[in-house]
């Protein structure tokens, strides 16, 4: 499906806005990498990478984490929930609960 990624990003944006999150995005200075959304939850600035499938490769999110060392990051996809070294993999169907889920670690 040609628009699967765009529709998935739109869904995530709507879920984030329901929670009153202010939404931004990030691009690298060379415009090679981009993170779909950046928001603040409590005292944390949270980069969010959206994947429409189970694909867990998020090179842009890896670049952001390398450059800025955020305590918490989110990748949302069709994969199962997992927390690994400050990286939260949140299934798409749970992204509306992100604000609660990032308090688990």
Language-model region placement:
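A cross-kingdom feature that marks ATP-driven nucleic-acid transaction machinery
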Residues: 1-105
């Amino acid at each position: 499906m040609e628009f699967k990624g765009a529709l998935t990003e739109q869904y995530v944006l709507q879920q984030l806005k329901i929670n009153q999150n202010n939404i931004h995005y990030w691009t690298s200075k060379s415009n090679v990498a981009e993170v779909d959304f950046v928001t603040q939850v409590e005292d944390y600035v949270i980069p969010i990478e959206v994947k429409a499938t189970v694909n867990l490769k998020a090179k842009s999110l890896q670049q952001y984490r390398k450059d800025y060392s955020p305590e918490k990051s989110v990748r949302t996809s069709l994969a199962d929930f997992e927390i690994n070294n400050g990286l939260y993999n949140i299934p798409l169907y749970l992204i509306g609960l992100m604000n609660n889920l990032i308090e688990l670690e």
